[in-house]
Amino acid sequence: MLDTTANDEVQALLDTFGAALERGDIDAATACFQDECYWRDLVTFTWNIHTSEGKEAIAGMLRSQLAATRPSGWKIAAGESAAEEGGVTTAWIEFETGVARGYGLVRLMGGKIWTLLTTMVELKGHEEHKGFNRPLGAKHGAGKHRPSWKEEREAEARELGYSRQPYVVIIGGGQGGIALGARLRQLGVPAIIIEKNERPGDSWRNRYKSLCLHDPVWYDHLPYIKFPENWPVFAPKDKIGDWLEMYTKVMELNYWAKTTCKSAKFDEKTKEWTVVVDRDGQEVTLKPKQLVLATGMSGKANVPTYPGMETFKGDQHHSSKHPGPDAYKGKKAVVIGSNNSAHDICAALWENDVDVTMVQRSSTHIVRSDTLMDVGLGGLYSEQAVQSGMTTEKADLIFASLPYRILHTFQIPLYDKMKEIDAEFYAGLEKAGFWLDWGVDGSGLFMKYLRRGSGYYIDVGASQLIIDGKIKLAHGNVKEIVADG
C-alpha cells in the first residue's frame, strides 16, 4: 500500500470538495465533513462573520449562498505545506469566488474536514494599491498649474463632508476605527473618522499614568505599518497614542477630532444615513451610505453608585479619570475592583508611598505575564514565532479559525500548565486571601475575555505586592461610603 503525504491527503479532499461545490452538489460537499464539524466564514460566503456548526447547518448555509458565491480553485496555498500532529492534519488553503480571492485554514481528522476557515483577501477589480500596484507618487512629465500632493490633501480635507459626501462614516477614532479607515483608504473608499477627543491617540493618553499594554507587540500591529523591531514588547500608553497620531497622518486618513455624533438616521428610500455631528462647535450634516460604530468595548465607564458617595469629603473618581498617583502621596486610598485597571492603579499608588487597599467584590482570574507570553501566546505571538515564519496575519487567522464552541478545549490544557508552573505564586495569593478563579470551565483568560470582557488581571507585579501585604485586601460588596472615609 502506497503512503500518501499530508499534502496529498489535503489536496485530494479539496479536489473532491471543490468539484462538489462547482456542480452544486451540497450532499457531496457536506460528505467531506466529519459528523462534528465547523465552518467559520469571514465574509467570503456569507458576507458576514458566521459559524456553521454541523453538517445540517453547513448544508443550510450552502443552499442559501452557494449559487451566488461560485467558489472554485481550491488548493493548498502557494509556498505552504500541510502538517500532521496528534491525528489532525492542518493546511493553509486558497480559493476564489465569483467576486473575490480567498484564503483559509482547514483541519482534517480521519480524512474529513473538522474545521474550515474561509476569509476574503480581496475583491476582484478592487485590489489594494500596494506592492506591484502601489501608487507612483511623483507625477512624471510636465503640466501647468499642477497641484502638489499637499495641495491635493488639503483640498480633500476641505471638500469631504461638505461639497462631497463620504461613502463611510466611522464613529470612534481609536485603534479599531483608525485601522478600518486605513483599509478603506487603500480601497479608494471615501471615509471620515469622527472622534470626540482633541487628537488621535488621546483615548490612550487620557488613561491612568502607569498604563502600559498587556498584550505583546506581535499581537498589536496595525495594517500596512508594523511597529519597528526595537519597539517595546509592552508599550506605554503615551507611546501608543503618539503612534496612532502618526499613523493617521502617514496613512492619509480623514480624521475629524473634537467631533461628536448628535444623531444618526437611516432612510430606507435613499439607502443612506443622515448623520449630524458637532465638529468643534460647528454642526455638520453627513450623508454616508455606510455607518460604522467603532466606539470600543471598554471605553464607556461602568461607574457604580453607593449610598453616601455624595457626602464623601475626599477625592473619588472612576479609573478612566484617574490622574495618576502623584497627588495622593502620603495619603490613604481605596480602590474598588480587582481587575487589570485596579491592580495597575494600586501598584502605582504603592510605588508613590500611598497606603492603598483593594476591595475585591468577586473572584478574579490572574495569569502571570511571563507565563502567558511563554505558554499561552509564544507559538503565535513572540520573537520565536516570528523567527519560525509565523506572521501576525497568520496568527490572527489561526485564532479566528477556532469556533467558540471548541476554543475552550484548546485553552484548558494551556491554563492547566500555567497553574502548574506558577503553583507557588497562586498559593501565595490564596494565602493572602485573594479570591482566584480560572473561568467557568478552567479555560482561562481568553475565554473569559470573550464571554465577559472583564474579570481578569495579567500580572506585571501587583500580585506580589498583594502576597507581601503591601497592597491591603478587603472583600465583599460596598455597603456605604461615609463622609470621612
Where are these regions (language model features)?
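Short, low-complexity N-terminal intrinsically disordered segments enriched in polar/charged residues
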Residues: 1-35, 154-165
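Exposed beta-sheet edge and beta->alpha loop/turn motif
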Residues: 83-127
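Glycine-rich dinucleotide-binding loop and its adjacent helix/turn
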Residues: 119, 125-167, 173, 185-187, ...
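Accessory recognition modules or surfaces
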Residues: 90-102, 125, 129, 136, ...
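A solvent-exposed, acidic/Ser-Thr-rich amphipathic alpha-helical stretch
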Residues: 7, 19, 23-85
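Glycine-rich active-site loop/strand segments that organize a redox cofactor
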Residues: 205-242, 363-432
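Flavin (primarily FAD) cofactor-binding/catalytic cores of flavoenzymes
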Residues: 166, 189, 194-196, 237-340, ...
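Conserved Rossmann-like nucleotide-cofactor binding loop
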Residues: 176, 198-199, 341, 364
